[in-house]
Amino acid sequence: MLHTTQRLCCSAHHNNNDFLFMRVITGTLKGRHFDVPRSFKARPTTDFAKENLFNVVRAYIDFEDDCEALDLFTGTGSISLELVSRGCKRVISVEKEPLHYTFINKIAKELKAEQWLPLRGDVFKYITRCGEKFNFVFADPPYALKELATIPDLVFEHNLLKDDGLFVLEHGKDYDFSEHPNFVEHRHYGSVNFSFFKNKGEE
């Protein structure tokens, strides 16, 4: 159960020189905002890109139907908060950067969001050791990450998706996953690109 004491956002609005202003788009936390320090390496997905992303995702996933989600490279926590707000049964967020992890863990505690579990650790190690399956997996690695292109293969090699699950990877314009055997579709909103993947045989 959520008891909201603050508000969050996911766009690149500015409220002063030290913070980025971020907002939850939809759900029980709609309109809530948080200030994200500009000193963070991670930057939130824009409102425009995020809203369009979830408009596509909801055609594949019913978040309120016992949905279990995994958010990799969580960053500021904006996607995880959308998942919590939209009614996911459980949300696991994996983030290696200590400042980012502390930030999202504090938010989860302040919201008393018992279904939200932030974890601090290396995403690649987590994938290999996870042993669980999810309805929805999202990954937003740094665009310059040299291992970025390997992430879809790792997700499917380690069976992170349930049979009808969906994996979405956010990436820069220089990547093309259309030949990947699990690729479903690609969307781009400004400079933000999303590639969608499902298990073979799932449409």
Question: What kind of region is each of these model predictions?
Answer:
Residues 2-203:
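Class I S-adenosyl-L-methionine-dependent methyltransferase catalytic core
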